[in-house]
UniProtKB/Swiss-Prot annotation:
Predominant localisation class: endoplasmic reticulum
Binding site for [4Fe-4S] cluster 2: 213, 217, 220
Superkingdom assignment: Eukaryota
Modification sites for Phosphothreonine: 498
Organism: Mus musculus
Record-level GO BP terms: maintenance of translational fidelity; tRNA methylthiolation
Localisation per UniProt entry: Endoplasmic reticulum membrane
Keyword tags: 4Fe-4S, Endoplasmic reticulum, Iron, Iron-sulfur, Membrane, Metal-binding, Phosphoprotein, S-adenosyl-L-methionine, Transferase, Transmembrane, Transmembrane helix, tRNA processing
CDD domains: Radical_SAM
Protein name from the UniProt record: Threonylcarbamoyladenosine tRNA methylthiotransferase
Protein backbone atom coordinates (compact mmCIF):
# COMPACT_ATOMS: atom_id res chain seq x y z
CA UNK A 1 0.00 0.00 0.00
CA UNK A 2 1.12 3.59 -0.44
CA UNK A 3 3.76 4.70 1.96
CA UNK A 4 2.34 8.19 2.05
CA UNK A 5 -1.28 9.09 2.58
CA UNK A 6 -2.85 12.28 1.36
CA UNK A 7 -6.48 13.30 1.76
CA UNK A 8 -5.94 16.75 0.27
CA UNK A 9 -7.79 17.26 -3.01
CA UNK A 10 -5.14 18.37 -5.46
CA UNK A 11 -5.07 20.07 -8.83
CA UNK A 12 -1.65 18.77 -9.73
CA UNK A 13 0.41 15.73 -8.83
CA UNK A 14 3.51 17.89 -8.62
CA UNK A 15 2.27 19.10 -5.21
CA UNK A 16 2.81 15.64 -3.72
CA UNK A 17 5.88 14.86 -1.61
CA UNK A 18 6.27 11.29 -0.40
CA UNK A 19 7.15 10.47 3.18
CA UNK A 20 10.25 8.87 1.71
CA UNK A 21 11.47 12.25 0.42
CA UNK A 22 13.87 14.33 2.47
CA UNK A 23 12.40 16.91 4.78
CA UNK A 24 12.87 20.52 3.59
CA UNK A 25 15.45 21.26 6.25
CA UNK A 26 17.38 18.12 5.28
CA UNK A 27 17.42 19.09 1.62
CA UNK A 28 18.73 22.58 2.40
CA UNK A 29 21.48 21.46 4.80
CA UNK A 30 24.97 21.77 3.27
CA UNK A 31 27.60 19.09 3.85
CA UNK A 32 30.44 20.54 1.80
CA UNK A 33 32.58 21.36 4.88
CA UNK A 34 32.02 18.03 6.67
CA UNK A 35 34.83 15.47 6.61
CA UNK A 36 33.70 11.85 7.05
CA UNK A 37 34.48 10.42 10.46
CA UNK A 38 36.55 7.24 10.25
CA UNK A 39 35.54 4.16 12.23
CA UNK A 40 37.95 1.30 11.56
CA UNK A 41 35.62 -1.47 12.73
CA UNK A 42 32.97 -0.50 10.13
CA UNK A 43 35.32 -0.39 7.16
CA UNK A 44 33.43 -3.14 5.30
CA UNK A 45 30.12 -1.30 5.68
CA UNK A 46 30.82 0.87 2.65
CA UNK A 47 31.20 -2.18 0.48
CA UNK A 48 28.18 -3.99 1.92
CA UNK A 49 25.68 -1.13 1.56
CA UNK A 50 26.14 -0.34 -2.09
CA UNK A 51 23.13 1.23 -3.84
CA UNK A 52 21.01 -1.26 -5.73
CA UNK A 53 19.24 -0.79 -9.03
CA UNK A 54 15.53 0.01 -8.68
CA UNK A 55 13.27 -3.06 -8.70
CA UNK A 56 10.67 -3.62 -11.40
CA UNK A 57 7.90 -2.97 -8.88
CA UNK A 58 8.90 0.70 -8.55
CA UNK A 59 9.69 1.58 -12.16
CA UNK A 60 6.43 3.00 -13.58
CA UNK A 61 5.41 1.80 -17.02
CA UNK A 62 6.22 -1.90 -16.91
CA UNK A 63 3.63 -3.18 -14.42
CA UNK A 64 0.55 -5.28 -15.07
CA UNK A 65 -2.76 -3.56 -14.38
CA UNK A 66 -6.15 -5.14 -13.76
CA UNK A 67 -9.18 -2.94 -14.43
CA UNK A 68 -12.60 -3.69 -12.94
CA UNK A 69 -15.62 -1.59 -13.94
CA UNK A 70 -19.10 -1.55 -12.45
CA UNK A 71 -22.18 0.24 -13.73
CA UNK A 72 -23.49 1.90 -16.85
CA UNK A 73 -22.24 2.17 -20.43
CA UNK A 74 -20.79 5.60 -19.65
CA UNK A 75 -18.65 4.09 -16.90
CA UNK A 76 -17.59 1.26 -19.20
CA UNK A 77 -16.51 3.80 -21.80
CA UNK A 78 -14.40 5.58 -19.16
CA UNK A 79 -12.80 2.25 -18.28
CA UNK A 80 -11.95 1.61 -21.94
CA UNK A 81 -10.32 5.03 -22.24
CA UNK A 82 -8.22 4.51 -19.11
CA UNK A 83 -7.10 1.08 -20.33
CA UNK A 84 -6.09 2.51 -23.70
CA UNK A 85 -3.99 5.30 -22.24
CA UNK A 86 -2.21 2.99 -19.83
CA UNK A 87 -1.44 0.48 -22.59
CA UNK A 88 -0.20 3.27 -24.86
CA UNK A 89 2.31 4.27 -22.18
CA UNK A 90 3.67 0.75 -21.85
CA UNK A 91 1.61 -0.82 -19.08
CA UNK A 92 0.24 -4.32 -19.64
CA UNK A 93 -3.52 -4.64 -19.16
CA UNK A 94 -4.30 -8.07 -17.73
CA UNK A 95 -7.52 -9.99 -17.12
CA UNK A 96 -5.87 -11.90 -14.27
CA UNK A 97 -6.38 -9.95 -11.04
CA UNK A 98 -3.94 -12.02 -9.01
CA UNK A 99 -1.21 -11.50 -11.60
CA UNK A 100 -1.59 -7.71 -11.59
CA UNK A 101 0.68 -5.27 -9.75
CA UNK A 102 -2.01 -2.59 -9.54
CA UNK A 103 -5.81 -2.70 -9.47
CA UNK A 104 -7.78 0.12 -11.09
CA UNK A 105 -11.29 -0.07 -9.63
CA UNK A 106 -13.90 1.93 -11.58
CA UNK A 107 -16.98 2.26 -9.38
CA UNK A 108 -20.74 2.85 -9.69
CA UNK A 109 -22.81 4.74 -7.12
CA UNK A 110 -26.34 3.99 -8.37
CA UNK A 111 -27.06 1.12 -5.96
CA UNK A 112 -25.77 -0.04 -2.59
CA UNK A 113 -24.79 -3.53 -3.85
CA UNK A 114 -22.49 -2.04 -6.50
CA UNK A 115 -20.71 0.06 -3.88
CA UNK A 116 -20.49 -2.97 -1.58
CA UNK A 117 -18.69 -4.92 -4.33
CA UNK A 118 -16.39 -1.94 -4.84
CA UNK A 119 -15.58 -1.72 -1.12
CA UNK A 120 -14.94 -5.46 -0.90
CA UNK A 121 -12.58 -5.27 -3.89
CA UNK A 122 -10.58 -2.54 -2.16
CA UNK A 123 -10.29 -4.69 0.94
CA UNK A 124 -9.19 -7.69 -1.10
CA UNK A 125 -6.57 -5.62 -2.93
CA UNK A 126 -5.16 -4.43 0.38
CA UNK A 127 -5.06 -7.98 1.72
CA UNK A 128 -3.10 -9.05 -1.37
CA UNK A 129 -0.73 -6.05 -1.10
CA UNK A 130 -1.78 -4.64 -4.46
CA UNK A 131 -1.35 -1.01 -5.41
CA UNK A 132 -4.80 0.55 -5.85
CA UNK A 133 -6.23 3.43 -7.91
CA UNK A 134 -9.92 4.26 -7.54
CA UNK A 135 -12.13 5.77 -10.24
CA UNK A 136 -15.80 6.28 -11.04
CA UNK A 137 -18.73 7.88 -9.27
CA UNK A 138 -18.29 6.59 -5.71
CA UNK A 139 -15.00 8.35 -4.82
CA UNK A 140 -15.95 11.37 -6.95
CA UNK A 141 -19.17 11.88 -4.97
CA UNK A 142 -17.76 11.07 -1.51
CA UNK A 143 -13.94 11.17 -1.55
CA UNK A 144 -13.63 11.48 2.23
CA UNK A 145 -15.26 8.19 3.16
CA UNK A 146 -13.21 6.30 5.73
CA UNK A 147 -12.54 3.28 3.53
CA UNK A 148 -11.04 5.54 0.83
CA UNK A 149 -8.43 7.15 3.09
CA UNK A 150 -4.87 6.97 1.86
CA UNK A 151 -5.85 5.69 -1.60
CA UNK A 152 -5.29 7.34 -4.97
CA UNK A 153 -8.37 8.63 -6.80
CA UNK A 154 -8.87 9.68 -10.42
CA UNK A 155 -11.98 11.83 -10.92
CA UNK A 156 -14.61 11.20 -13.61
CA UNK A 157 -13.48 14.30 -15.53
CA UNK A 158 -9.77 13.56 -15.09
CA UNK A 159 -9.48 10.16 -16.78
CA UNK A 160 -7.09 11.63 -19.34
CA UNK A 161 -4.56 11.88 -16.47
CA UNK A 162 -4.84 8.28 -15.35
CA UNK A 163 -1.23 7.56 -16.34
CA UNK A 164 0.03 10.24 -13.94
CA UNK A 165 -2.04 8.88 -11.08
CA UNK A 166 -0.94 5.30 -11.72
CA UNK A 167 2.73 6.29 -11.96
CA UNK A 168 2.64 8.19 -8.68
CA UNK A 169 0.77 5.37 -6.97
CA UNK A 170 3.40 2.86 -8.07
CA UNK A 171 6.06 5.15 -6.59
CA UNK A 172 4.26 4.96 -3.25
CA UNK A 173 2.35 8.24 -3.33
CA UNK A 174 -1.36 8.74 -2.69
CA UNK A 175 -2.82 11.28 -5.12
CA UNK A 176 -6.29 12.60 -5.88
CA UNK A 177 -7.44 14.44 -9.00
CA UNK A 178 -11.10 15.38 -8.66
CA UNK A 179 -11.44 18.78 -10.34
CA UNK A 180 -13.75 19.75 -13.20
CA UNK A 181 -12.52 20.70 -16.65
CA UNK A 182 -13.49 24.20 -17.71
CA UNK A 183 -12.92 26.47 -20.70
CA UNK A 184 -13.35 30.19 -20.02
CA UNK A 185 -15.36 29.32 -16.94
CA UNK A 186 -17.68 26.94 -18.80
CA UNK A 187 -17.71 23.31 -17.70
CA UNK A 188 -16.55 20.89 -20.37
CA UNK A 189 -18.03 17.47 -21.01
CA UNK A 190 -14.97 15.72 -19.65
CA UNK A 191 -11.90 14.08 -21.14
CA UNK A 192 -11.19 14.36 -24.87
CA UNK A 193 -12.96 11.89 -27.14
CA UNK A 194 -9.85 11.26 -29.26
CA UNK A 195 -7.93 9.55 -26.48
CA UNK A 196 -6.75 5.98 -27.12
CA UNK A 197 -8.91 3.23 -25.71
CA UNK A 198 -9.12 -0.54 -25.55
CA UNK A 199 -12.64 -1.58 -26.45
CA UNK A 200 -14.00 -4.44 -24.40
CA UNK A 201 -15.61 -5.56 -27.64
CA UNK A 202 -13.62 -4.40 -30.71
CA UNK A 203 -16.88 -4.32 -32.69
CA UNK A 204 -18.73 -1.92 -30.37
CA UNK A 205 -17.85 1.72 -29.73
CA UNK A 206 -19.43 3.45 -26.71
CA UNK A 207 -19.60 7.23 -27.15
CA UNK A 208 -20.58 9.49 -24.26
CA UNK A 209 -22.38 12.41 -25.88
CA UNK A 210 -22.69 14.39 -22.64
CA UNK A 211 -22.01 14.09 -18.93
CA UNK A 212 -24.26 15.03 -16.04
CA UNK A 213 -27.91 16.00 -16.30
CA UNK A 214 -30.44 18.78 -15.68
CA UNK A 215 -32.48 16.97 -13.05
CA UNK A 216 -32.29 16.76 -9.27
CA UNK A 217 -33.87 13.37 -8.53
CA UNK A 218 -34.12 12.88 -4.79
CA UNK A 219 -32.76 9.32 -4.87
CA UNK A 220 -29.85 9.81 -7.27
CA UNK A 221 -26.22 9.84 -6.17
CA UNK A 222 -24.82 9.97 -9.71
CA UNK A 223 -25.65 13.69 -9.96
CA UNK A 224 -23.27 14.31 -7.04
CA UNK A 225 -20.47 12.74 -9.11
CA UNK A 226 -21.24 13.73 -12.71
CA UNK A 227 -22.71 17.17 -11.99
CA UNK A 228 -24.77 19.34 -14.30
CA UNK A 229 -25.22 18.81 -18.02
CA UNK A 230 -22.14 19.30 -20.20
CA UNK A 231 -22.40 18.26 -23.86
CA UNK A 232 -19.67 17.45 -26.36
CA UNK A 233 -19.74 19.43 -29.64
CA UNK A 234 -21.40 17.68 -32.58
CA UNK A 235 -18.28 17.78 -34.76
CA UNK A 236 -16.20 15.97 -32.10
CA UNK A 237 -18.84 13.26 -31.74
CA UNK A 238 -19.13 12.77 -35.49
CA UNK A 239 -15.34 12.58 -35.81
CA UNK A 240 -15.17 9.95 -33.07
CA UNK A 241 -17.83 7.88 -34.85
CA UNK A 242 -15.97 8.10 -38.17
CA UNK A 243 -12.71 7.01 -36.54
CA UNK A 244 -14.50 4.06 -34.93
CA UNK A 245 -15.86 2.83 -38.25
CA UNK A 246 -12.37 3.12 -39.75
CA UNK A 247 -11.20 0.74 -36.99
CA UNK A 248 -13.78 -1.91 -37.84
CA UNK A 249 -16.53 -1.01 -35.38
CA UNK A 250 -19.96 -2.09 -36.64
CA UNK A 251 -22.14 -0.90 -33.75
CA UNK A 252 -22.15 2.41 -31.88
CA UNK A 253 -23.83 3.02 -28.54
CA UNK A 254 -24.62 6.60 -27.59
CA UNK A 255 -24.63 6.96 -23.83
CA UNK A 256 -24.89 9.53 -21.05
CA UNK A 257 -26.81 10.15 -17.85
CA UNK A 258 -29.63 11.50 -20.06
CA UNK A 259 -29.19 11.49 -23.83
CA UNK A 260 -32.48 13.37 -24.31
CA UNK A 261 -31.03 16.48 -22.67
CA UNK A 262 -28.09 16.56 -25.10
CA UNK A 263 -27.17 19.99 -26.44
CA UNK A 264 -29.28 22.19 -24.21
CA UNK A 265 -26.13 23.74 -22.77
CA UNK A 266 -24.49 24.40 -26.16
CA UNK A 267 -27.44 25.57 -28.24
CA UNK A 268 -28.35 22.38 -30.08
CA UNK A 269 -30.42 19.22 -29.49
CA UNK A 270 -30.42 15.44 -29.80
CA UNK A 271 -32.18 15.12 -33.20
CA UNK A 272 -29.65 17.50 -34.78
CA UNK A 273 -26.80 15.33 -33.51
CA UNK A 274 -28.46 12.10 -34.65
CA UNK A 275 -29.07 13.33 -38.20
CA UNK A 276 -25.37 14.25 -38.44
CA UNK A 277 -24.35 10.82 -37.15
CA UNK A 278 -26.54 8.78 -39.50
CA UNK A 279 -24.79 10.50 -42.42
CA UNK A 280 -21.52 8.75 -41.50
CA UNK A 281 -22.86 5.32 -40.50
CA UNK A 282 -21.70 2.89 -43.20
CA UNK A 283 -23.99 0.27 -44.64
CA UNK A 284 -23.86 -2.84 -42.49
CA UNK A 285 -23.40 -0.88 -39.23
CA UNK A 286 -25.95 0.19 -36.63
CA UNK A 287 -26.46 2.89 -34.00
CA UNK A 288 -28.13 2.36 -30.62
CA UNK A 289 -29.49 5.30 -28.66
CA UNK A 290 -29.09 5.28 -24.88
CA UNK A 291 -31.36 6.22 -22.01
CA UNK A 292 -33.50 9.35 -22.20
CA UNK A 293 -35.90 10.74 -19.61
CA UNK A 294 -39.47 11.57 -20.75
CA UNK A 295 -39.44 15.40 -20.36
CA UNK A 296 -36.81 16.07 -23.01
CA UNK A 297 -37.86 13.64 -25.70
CA UNK A 298 -41.41 15.01 -25.52
CA UNK A 299 -40.22 18.10 -27.38
CA UNK A 300 -38.80 16.08 -30.28
CA UNK A 301 -41.21 13.19 -30.77
CA UNK A 302 -41.77 13.74 -34.50
CA UNK A 303 -38.06 13.96 -35.31
CA UNK A 304 -37.17 11.09 -33.00
CA UNK A 305 -39.72 8.84 -34.71
CA UNK A 306 -38.17 9.62 -38.09
CA UNK A 307 -34.68 8.84 -36.80
CA UNK A 308 -35.76 5.59 -35.14
CA UNK A 309 -37.21 4.51 -38.49
CA UNK A 310 -33.83 4.96 -40.17
CA UNK A 311 -32.51 1.60 -41.45
CA UNK A 312 -29.16 2.04 -39.67
CA UNK A 313 -30.64 3.03 -36.30
CA UNK A 314 -32.07 0.44 -33.93
CA UNK A 315 -35.80 0.94 -33.26
CA UNK A 316 -35.08 0.85 -29.54
CA UNK A 317 -35.35 3.39 -26.76
CA UNK A 318 -34.74 3.19 -23.01
CA UNK A 319 -37.18 5.52 -21.19
CA UNK A 320 -37.22 5.09 -17.38
CA UNK A 321 -40.63 5.62 -15.79
CA UNK A 322 -39.59 4.61 -12.20
CA UNK A 323 -43.19 4.64 -10.94
CA UNK A 324 -46.73 4.89 -12.33
CA UNK A 325 -47.87 6.99 -9.38
CA UNK A 326 -47.81 10.75 -9.88
CA UNK A 327 -47.42 11.35 -6.15
CA UNK A 328 -44.33 9.12 -6.05
CA UNK A 329 -42.92 10.80 -9.16
CA UNK A 330 -43.41 14.15 -7.44
CA UNK A 331 -41.52 12.93 -4.37
CA UNK A 332 -38.77 11.71 -6.70
CA UNK A 333 -38.70 15.14 -8.45
CA UNK A 334 -38.87 13.41 -11.82
CA UNK A 335 -40.41 16.47 -13.57
CA UNK A 336 -43.05 14.51 -15.50
CA UNK A 337 -46.27 12.66 -14.82
CA UNK A 338 -47.39 9.20 -15.90
CA UNK A 339 -49.46 10.71 -18.72
CA UNK A 340 -46.27 12.20 -20.21
CA UNK A 341 -44.59 8.80 -20.22
CA UNK A 342 -47.61 7.15 -21.84
CA UNK A 343 -47.77 9.86 -24.48
CA UNK A 344 -44.14 9.22 -25.47
CA UNK A 345 -44.57 5.44 -25.59
CA UNK A 346 -47.91 5.51 -27.43
CA UNK A 347 -46.63 7.97 -30.04
CA UNK A 348 -43.46 5.97 -30.76
CA UNK A 349 -45.34 2.68 -30.92
CA UNK A 350 -47.65 4.20 -33.51
CA UNK A 351 -44.99 5.92 -35.62
CA UNK A 352 -42.25 3.27 -35.27
CA UNK A 353 -44.03 -0.09 -35.63
CA UNK A 354 -42.41 -2.84 -33.56
CA UNK A 355 -40.21 -0.47 -31.53
CA UNK A 356 -38.71 -1.88 -28.33
CA UNK A 357 -39.33 0.31 -25.28
CA UNK A 358 -37.22 -0.53 -22.24
CA UNK A 359 -37.95 1.04 -18.87
CA UNK A 360 -36.90 1.10 -15.20
CA UNK A 361 -39.02 0.83 -12.06
CA UNK A 362 -38.10 1.44 -8.41
CA UNK A 363 -40.02 -0.60 -5.84
CA UNK A 364 -40.50 0.71 -2.31
CA UNK A 365 -39.56 4.36 -2.73
CA UNK A 366 -40.17 6.32 0.51
CA UNK A 367 -43.86 7.16 0.80
CA UNK A 368 -44.98 4.60 -1.80
CA UNK A 369 -48.34 3.16 -0.72
CA UNK A 370 -49.95 -0.10 -1.77
CA UNK A 371 -52.18 1.89 -4.13
CA UNK A 372 -49.14 3.60 -5.67
CA UNK A 373 -47.53 0.23 -6.25
CA UNK A 374 -50.67 -1.22 -7.82
CA UNK A 375 -50.67 1.64 -10.34
CA UNK A 376 -47.18 0.56 -11.36
CA UNK A 377 -48.28 -3.06 -11.68
CA UNK A 378 -51.14 -2.00 -13.96
CA UNK A 379 -48.73 -0.08 -16.19
CA UNK A 380 -46.54 -3.16 -16.67
CA UNK A 381 -49.58 -5.34 -17.36
CA UNK A 382 -50.83 -2.84 -19.93
CA UNK A 383 -47.63 -2.28 -21.90
CA UNK A 384 -45.90 -5.62 -21.33
CA UNK A 385 -42.45 -4.09 -21.67
CA UNK A 386 -40.07 -6.62 -23.27
CA UNK A 387 -37.15 -5.12 -21.33
CA UNK A 388 -37.82 -4.10 -17.73
CA UNK A 389 -35.25 -3.26 -15.04
CA UNK A 390 -36.82 -3.73 -11.60
CA UNK A 391 -34.89 -2.21 -8.71
CA UNK A 392 -35.59 -2.44 -5.01
CA UNK A 393 -35.07 1.01 -3.50
CA UNK A 394 -31.77 1.52 -1.69
CA UNK A 395 -31.26 4.83 0.17
CA UNK A 396 -28.03 6.40 -1.03
CA UNK A 397 -26.15 8.44 1.59
CA UNK A 398 -26.41 12.18 1.12
CA UNK A 399 -29.60 12.11 -0.96
CA UNK A 400 -32.94 13.62 0.18
CA UNK A 401 -34.66 10.25 -0.22
CA UNK A 402 -32.28 8.71 2.31
CA UNK A 403 -33.56 11.14 4.95
CA UNK A 404 -37.24 10.38 4.30
CA UNK A 405 -39.28 7.81 6.20
CA UNK A 406 -38.48 4.46 4.62
CA UNK A 407 -40.82 1.72 3.45
CA UNK A 408 -40.16 -1.39 5.60
CA UNK A 409 -37.54 -3.67 4.08
CA UNK A 410 -39.83 -6.69 3.90
CA UNK A 411 -42.44 -4.63 2.03
CA UNK A 412 -39.88 -3.41 -0.51
CA UNK A 413 -38.66 -6.94 -1.03
CA UNK A 414 -42.18 -8.31 -1.51
CA UNK A 415 -43.14 -5.60 -4.00
CA UNK A 416 -40.00 -6.33 -5.99
CA UNK A 417 -40.92 -10.01 -6.10
CA UNK A 418 -44.53 -9.27 -7.06
CA UNK A 419 -43.55 -7.02 -9.95
CA UNK A 420 -40.96 -9.52 -11.15
CA UNK A 421 -43.66 -12.18 -11.16
CA UNK A 422 -45.84 -9.97 -13.38
CA UNK A 423 -42.94 -9.33 -15.74
CA UNK A 424 -42.22 -13.04 -16.12
CA UNK A 425 -45.88 -13.87 -16.71
CA UNK A 426 -45.68 -13.00 -20.41
CA UNK A 427 -43.33 -13.82 -23.26
CA UNK A 428 -42.93 -10.81 -25.55
CA UNK A 429 -41.34 -12.70 -28.45
CA UNK A 430 -43.62 -15.68 -29.13
CA UNK A 431 -45.21 -13.97 -32.14
CA UNK A 432 -41.77 -13.60 -33.76
CA UNK A 433 -41.38 -17.32 -34.47
CA UNK A 434 -41.40 -17.97 -38.21
CA UNK A 435 -40.16 -14.49 -39.15
CA UNK A 436 -37.15 -13.93 -41.40
CA UNK A 437 -34.91 -11.23 -39.96
CA UNK A 438 -31.65 -9.50 -40.73
CA UNK A 439 -29.38 -9.47 -37.68
CA UNK A 440 -26.00 -7.97 -36.79
CA UNK A 441 -23.64 -10.40 -35.01
CA UNK A 442 -21.39 -8.73 -32.42
CA UNK A 443 -20.36 -11.13 -29.62
CA UNK A 444 -20.34 -14.59 -28.10
CA UNK A 445 -22.96 -15.75 -25.58
CA UNK A 446 -22.00 -16.19 -21.93
CA UNK A 447 -22.22 -19.96 -22.21
CA UNK A 448 -20.07 -19.88 -25.38
CA UNK A 449 -22.66 -21.97 -27.25
CA UNK A 450 -23.93 -19.26 -29.61
CA UNK A 451 -23.07 -15.97 -31.22
CA UNK A 452 -25.20 -13.03 -30.08
CA UNK A 453 -26.85 -10.84 -32.69
CA UNK A 454 -29.53 -8.14 -32.63
CA UNK A 455 -32.34 -7.50 -35.07
CA UNK A 456 -33.81 -4.21 -36.19
CA UNK A 457 -35.54 -3.74 -32.81
CA UNK A 458 -32.44 -4.58 -30.76
CA UNK A 459 -33.94 -7.90 -29.71
CA UNK A 460 -31.31 -10.50 -28.85
CA UNK A 461 -31.03 -13.26 -31.45
CA UNK A 462 -28.82 -16.30 -30.85
CA UNK A 463 -27.23 -17.78 -33.99
CA UNK A 464 -24.83 -20.69 -34.64
CA UNK A 465 -21.14 -20.03 -34.01
CA UNK A 466 -19.73 -19.46 -37.46
CA UNK A 467 -16.61 -17.23 -37.46
CA UNK A 468 -17.67 -15.83 -40.83
CA UNK A 469 -20.70 -14.23 -39.13
CA UNK A 470 -18.87 -12.17 -36.51
CA UNK A 471 -19.29 -8.44 -37.15
CA UNK A 472 -21.54 -9.12 -40.11
CA UNK A 473 -25.18 -8.77 -41.12
CA UNK A 474 -26.79 -12.19 -41.53
CA UNK A 475 -30.30 -13.23 -42.59
CA UNK A 476 -31.93 -15.79 -40.29
CA UNK A 477 -35.22 -17.61 -39.77
CA UNK A 478 -36.54 -17.37 -36.20
CA UNK A 479 -37.41 -20.83 -34.85
CA UNK A 480 -37.52 -20.39 -31.05
CA UNK A 481 -38.21 -17.72 -28.45
CA UNK A 482 -37.48 -17.24 -24.75
CA UNK A 483 -38.12 -14.51 -22.22
CA UNK A 484 -35.06 -12.52 -23.23
CA UNK A 485 -33.99 -13.96 -26.59
CA UNK A 486 -34.83 -15.39 -29.98
CA UNK A 487 -32.99 -18.14 -31.83
CA UNK A 488 -32.32 -17.89 -35.54
CA UNK A 489 -31.12 -20.31 -38.19
CA UNK A 490 -29.12 -18.69 -41.02
CA UNK A 491 -30.92 -18.89 -44.34
CA UNK A 492 -29.12 -21.39 -46.57
CA UNK A 493 -28.67 -18.94 -49.41
CA UNK A 494 -27.84 -16.02 -47.11
CA UNK A 495 -24.90 -13.76 -47.88
CA UNK A 496 -22.80 -12.17 -45.19
CA UNK A 497 -23.15 -8.46 -45.74
CA UNK A 498 -20.76 -5.73 -44.54
CA UNK A 499 -18.99 -4.33 -47.60
CA UNK A 500 -18.25 -0.91 -46.12
CA UNK A 501 -16.70 -1.79 -42.76
CA UNK A 502 -12.96 -2.08 -42.16
CA UNK A 503 -11.28 -5.03 -40.48
CA UNK A 504 -11.75 -4.69 -36.70
CA UNK A 505 -8.90 -4.27 -34.26
CA UNK A 506 -7.71 -7.33 -32.37
CA UNK A 507 -9.06 -7.86 -28.86
CA UNK A 508 -6.94 -5.80 -26.48
CA UNK A 509 -5.48 -3.64 -29.26
CA UNK A 510 -5.28 0.08 -28.55
CA UNK A 511 -7.48 2.28 -30.74
CA UNK A 512 -7.02 5.94 -31.52
CA UNK A 513 -3.21 5.94 -31.73
CA UNK A 514 -3.12 8.64 -34.38
CA UNK A 515 0.10 10.32 -35.45
CA UNK A 516 -0.94 13.43 -33.52
CA UNK A 517 -1.40 11.42 -30.33
CA UNK A 518 1.89 9.58 -30.83
CA UNK A 519 3.61 12.96 -31.16
CA UNK A 520 2.00 14.06 -27.90
CA UNK A 521 3.32 10.91 -26.26
CA UNK A 522 6.76 11.58 -27.66
CA UNK A 523 6.79 15.04 -26.06
CA UNK A 524 5.65 13.66 -22.71
CA UNK A 525 8.49 12.67 -20.38
CA UNK A 526 6.88 9.26 -19.96
CA UNK A 527 5.57 8.92 -23.48
CA UNK A 528 6.01 6.52 -26.37
CA UNK A 529 7.78 7.75 -29.48
CA UNK A 530 6.14 7.87 -32.88
CA UNK A 531 8.10 4.83 -33.99
CA UNK A 532 7.52 2.73 -30.87
CA UNK A 533 4.41 0.53 -30.79
CA UNK A 534 2.14 0.90 -27.77
CA UNK A 535 2.81 -2.71 -26.84
CA UNK A 536 6.51 -2.02 -26.25
CA UNK A 537 7.73 -0.53 -22.99
CA UNK A 538 9.58 2.38 -24.58
CA UNK A 539 8.79 4.90 -21.88
CA UNK A 540 9.59 2.45 -19.09
CA UNK A 541 12.88 1.51 -20.73
CA UNK A 542 14.01 5.11 -21.02
CA UNK A 543 13.20 5.70 -17.37
CA UNK A 544 15.05 2.52 -16.38
CA UNK A 545 18.13 3.63 -18.33
CA UNK A 546 18.04 6.96 -16.52
CA UNK A 547 17.72 5.31 -13.12
CA UNK A 548 20.48 2.80 -13.91
CA UNK A 549 22.82 5.64 -14.89
CA UNK A 550 22.01 7.26 -11.56
CA UNK A 551 22.81 3.92 -9.93
CA UNK A 552 26.20 3.78 -11.71
CA UNK A 553 27.02 7.25 -10.44
CA UNK A 554 26.06 6.31 -6.88
CA UNK A 555 28.15 3.15 -7.14
CA UNK A 556 31.21 5.15 -8.14
CA UNK A 557 30.73 7.51 -5.19
CA UNK A 558 30.36 4.57 -2.80
CA UNK A 559 33.48 2.92 -4.20
CA UNK A 560 35.43 6.14 -3.74
CA UNK A 561 34.29 6.43 -0.14
CA UNK A 562 35.26 2.83 0.52
CA UNK A 563 38.76 3.37 -0.91
CA UNK A 564 39.12 6.50 1.16
CA UNK A 565 38.14 4.56 4.27
CA UNK A 566 40.70 1.85 3.50
CA UNK A 567 43.38 4.46 2.94
CA UNK A 568 42.63 6.12 6.25
CA UNK A 569 42.53 2.74 7.97
CA UNK A 570 46.12 1.92 7.00
CA UNK A 571 47.45 5.47 7.24
CA UNK A 572 49.85 5.99 10.17
CA UNK A 573 48.05 7.47 13.18
CA UNK A 574 50.97 9.84 13.67
CA UNK A 575 50.21 11.49 10.36
CA UNK A 576 46.54 11.89 11.30
CA UNK A 577 47.47 13.70 14.53
CA UNK A 578 50.01 16.05 12.97
Amino acid sequence: MPSASCDVLLDDIEDIISQEDSKPQDRQFSRKHVFPKVRRRNTQKYLQEEPRPPSDSTIPGIQKIWIRTWGCSHNNSDGEYMAGQLAAYGYKITENASDADLWLLNSCTVKNPAEDHFRNSIKKAQEENKKVVLAGCVPQAQPRQDYLKGLSIIGVQQIDRVVEVVEETIKGHSVRLLGQKKDNGKRLGGARLDLPKIRKNPLIEIISINTGCLNACTYCKTKHARGNLASYPIDELVERAKQSFQEGVCEIWLTSEDTGAYGRDIGTDLPTLLWKLVEVIPEGAMLRLGMTNPPYILEHLEEMAKILNHPRVYAFLHIPVQSASDSVLMDMKREYCVADFKRVVDFLKEKVPGITIATDIICGFPGETDQDFQETVKLVEEYKFPSLFINQFYPRPGTPAAKAEQVPAHVKKQRTKDLSRVFHSYNPYDHKIGERQQVLVTEESFDSKFYVAHNRFYEQVLVPKNPAFMGKMVEVDIYESGKHFLKGQPVSETRVYTPSISKPLAKGEVSGLTKEFRNRLGNHPNGTSDTCPATQHGSAYSRMVLQMSQYDCALKVATGLALLALLLHFWPDSLLTM
